[in-house]
């Protein structure tokens, strides 16, 4: 089986590190960071990913993760890639799903069995 790839978008370094560590240790996944929407879109158009994890508010520039998800799902080439919002806020999760994301998880539940089961579908 080939290594599954995840694009982590808009996370601060500490959160990206926690997410990447969990995905590597649990699934053997490769995790690539993108700080901005433009960087993430460029990578998505040039590389193959099995999952995209998007922060609710991008650490680098304050961009909206919901807007990014909306943009990805409006792009014919990208909409087939599963996208999840990383947020502890239920209302943000509901908005993300409404614009095309898969049900996501919060950083507070990163290591919980339910989150691991959710991610297992894609990784």
Regions found by a protein language model. Name each.
Residues 109-119:
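C-terminal output helix
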Residues 22-26, 43, 95, 99:
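Alpha-helical interaction/dimerization surfaces of two-component signaling modules
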Residues 64-67, 88-105, 109:
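Alpha4 helix (beta4-alpha4-beta5 surface) of REC/receiver domains from two-component response regulators
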Residues 3-14, 19-23, 52:
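Conserved acidic segment of CheY-like receiver
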Residues 63-79:
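Short amphipathic alpha-helix used as the core "switch/output" element in two-component signaling
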Residues 12-16, 57-61, 90, 110-111:
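Short acidic, S/G/P-rich loop/turn micro-motifs used as interaction or catalytic elements
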Residues 79-90:
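A short, hydrophobic beta-strand element within the central beta-sheet of small alpha/beta folds
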Residues 35-51, 57:
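Acidic, metal-coordinating helix/loop segments flanking the phosphotransfer/catalytic sites
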């Amino acid at each position: 089986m080939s290594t599954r790839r995840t694009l982590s978008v808009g996370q601060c370094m500490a959160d990206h590190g926690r997410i990447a560590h969990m995905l590597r240790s649990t699934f053997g996944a490769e995790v690539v960071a993108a700080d901005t929407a433009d960087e993430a879109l460029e990578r998505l158009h040039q590389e193959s990913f099995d999952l995209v994890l998007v922060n609710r508010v991008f650490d680098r520039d304050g961009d909206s993760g919901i807007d990014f998800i909306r943009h990805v799902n409006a792009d014919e080439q990208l909409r087939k890639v599963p996208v999840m919002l990383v947020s502890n806020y239920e209302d943000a999760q509901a908005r993300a799903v409404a614009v095309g994301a898969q049900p996501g998880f919060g950083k507070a539940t990163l290591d919980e069995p339910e989150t691991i089961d959710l991610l297992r579908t894609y990784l």
